[in-house]
Amino acid sequence: KGNALGSGLGGSAASAVAGIVAAAALVEEPLERTELLKFAMQGEAVASGSVHVDNIAPSLYGGLVLTVGIDNPFVKQIPVPDTIRCVLVHPHMVLPTREARAILSKSVPLSDVIWQQANLAGFLAGCFTSDLALIRESLLDVVIEPQRQVLIPGFAAVKQAALAAGALGASISGAGPTVFAWVDAADAEKVRIGMVDAFARHGLESDSWVSAFDRAGARVVGD
């Protein structure tokens, strides 16, 4: 699958989904995606130690998704404006998910919860209405990012480089250390180079990608 361990790219979820989709292709009776989702969740639980659907659902369904519930999760694909690209920059370091979780506070100030909820609502509204200005205003994590950024050398500079090059927003992918940015397609390469250069200035080589959103999801390709 090409996802490094401890990268913040959802490697365990991608493995679980790939295995389930491949196995399902061998049976005579096709399985519904809802059934595949539950099987993949069990694989993710074995790999990561807990049952959760946040990485499984987008790996299986494709694109940006909203999930609600665990036992019978509700999955809704969220439309993304056609011109949006995602820039991903993975510095050559490993950040174990356990370490990234351990640094998080057990309590969150009410003011931050309110701000985070407002940002989420604005972000979703921006996606549904293709309002790039609203996405830019709302693509901000005020709860997790401030706590985890200390684990990623140069994060502040990388984020600032992305924004200076025209990104709508940038933050930590998963538990890190990969950093992502949402950008208009016209600015994607400039943003990618800026982020890579910022990591390099802090002594970290990196791999980087510019990707559109694959709305088709996991599937068997070729023979």
Task: Give, region by region, the residue ranges found by the protein language model.
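A short glycine/serine-rich beta->alpha loop
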Residues: K1-G10, E44-V51, K106-S111
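DPxDG-like acidic metal-binding loop motif
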Residues: G11-R33, L60-G62
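Short, well-structured alpha-helical segments that form the helix of a local strand-helix-strand
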Residues: E32-V46, A133-L140, R192-I193
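Alpha/beta catalytic cores of group-transfer enzymes, especially the acyltransferase/condensing modules
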Residues: R33-T83, A170-I172, F180
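Short beta-strand-to-loop capping motifs
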Residues: G69, P91, A181-A185
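Active-site rim beta-loop-alpha module in soluble metabolic enzymes
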Residues: L88-V150
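Glycine-rich, charge-dense phosphate/pyrophosphate-binding loop(s)
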Residues: C127-D223
